Structures are given as C-alpha cells and as structure tokens.
From Swiss-Prot:
Pathway per the UniProt entry: Purine metabolism; AMP biosynthesis via salvage pathway; AMP from adenine: step 1/1
Function noted in UniProt: Catalyzes a salvage reaction resulting in the formation of AMP, that is energically less costly than de novo synthesis.
InterPro entries registered for this protein in UniProt: Ade_phspho_trans, Adenine_PRTase, PRibTrfase_dom, PRTase-like
Protein's name according to its UniProt entry: Adenine phosphoribosyltransferase
Family, as annotated: Belongs to the purine/pyrimidine phosphoribosyltransferase family.
PANTHER family noted in UniProt: ADENINE PHOSPHORIBOSYLTRANSFERASE, PHOSPHORIBOSYLTRANSFERASE DOMAIN-CONTAINING PROTEIN
Cross-referenced Gene3D superfamilies: 3.40.50.2020
Cellular location(s): Cytoplasm
Assigned EC number: 2.4.2.7
Keywords, sorted A to Z: Cytoplasm, Glycosyltransferase, Purine salvage, Transferase
Gene Ontology molecular function terms on file: adenine phosphoribosyltransferase activity
Catalytic activity of the protein: AMP + diphosphate = 5-phospho-alpha-D-ribose 1-diphosphate + adenine
Length: 181
C-alpha cells in the first residue's frame, strides 16, 4: 500500500481528546468520510487489496462498518450483509453476545444471509479489543460461512484486538494505527 496515501488517510481522521470522558483520546472516523478524497482513497485501497481474492459477501458491523463495508462490497461487486444490534432486522436472525467493559451486548444477522461455504470479508471502522468483530465472526461461522479476512480503517494496537482475531485464524488488515487508548 502506498505510504503517502495511508498518511493522507490518517491525516483526515480527527483526534478528539477527553471524549467521551476524560483521559480518552477519540479517533473520529466521521471526519474521514466527510472528506471526499479521503473517503474515496480509503475505499480504493481496500478494493485494491482485496480484488484479487475470492469472496462471496462482505459483512459490516453496526454502525460504522456499514460506511466502509457497503461501498467496498459495491466496488468488489459483492453482496453486503449488515450485522445489527437486536431488534433491527425483520427476518429470522442468528444472535451472538459479547462482553463490554461494563456488561454485555448482542449482535444479530439474518439466518439466511450467508450460505454454508460462502467466503466472507468482515469490515469495520475500528479495531480496539476485537470483541464486536469476534462476535460477528462467530455468527458467520455458525451460519457455515468461512471467515479468513477482516479489514479495519483504524487500529488501536495497544488494546489487543489484532491478536484476538489472529487467534481465530483471521488475517487482519488495518490502514492506520493509533497507539494508546
């Protein structure tokens, strides 16, 4: 990947200190999608990286995974599957719980969205601890899908998400790293 393009993408991501609480440094990916060239270059880099690989579907996690997953699916001429919070999908769903810092949350996916044996690329905006994407991968695998790749715009490497997903047999692509929390 072109280092200048990656640096440009990183420069489009705003850093907000003390949000949502004191001591947290928030990486605001919405500033990237507000920037037409930054957003375009992000999707182009992801497309260039994955276009020679074989996938049947792209899955994006709620909500910012939709922002990057849907245009990437379009660029790769693949279907897009949204993974949502409970109560947002109208048909029969698979469900997977995952741990938060203070409690538990849940994700859902339509039962019929992925057929057994389909190869799936998972996309999200940010990789921190990896809990959300781990839950997503478990659902895809429960449906019989094959997940070997996950893509992220931002990674917070100090939080261990890449190691968590690698332990599941998933190759992780991240465009930019921001050290710290």
């Amino acid at each position: 990947m072109n280092r200048n393009t990656l640096d440009f993408i990183q420069s489009c991501i705003a850093t907000i200190p003390d949000y949502p609480k004191p001591g947290i440094i928030f990486r605001d990916v919405t500033s990237l999608v507000e920037h037409p060239q930054g957003f375009h270059q992000t999707i182009e880099l992801l497309k260039e990286h994955y276009q020679s690989m074989s996938f049947d579907k792209v899955v994006g996690t709620e909500a910012r995974g939709f922002i990057f997953g849907a245009p990437l699916a379009y660029a790769l001429q693949l279907g897009f599957i949204p993974v949502r919070k409970p109560g947002k999908l109208p048909r029969s769903v698979l469900e997977q719980s995952y741990q938060l810092e203070y409690g538990e949350d849940c994700l859902q996916m339509h039962c019929d969205a992925i057929k057994p044996g389909e190869k799936v690329l998972v996309v999200d905006d940010l990789l921190a601890t990896g809990g959300t994407v781990e839950a997503t991968i478990k659902m895809i695998r429960e449906a019989g899908g094959i997940v070997e790749h996950a893509a992220f715009v931002i990674s917070l490497p100090d939080l261990g998400g890449e190691e968590r997903l690698t332990a599941m047999g998933v190759n992780v692509l991240k465009l930019v790293d921001f050290p710290g929390h």
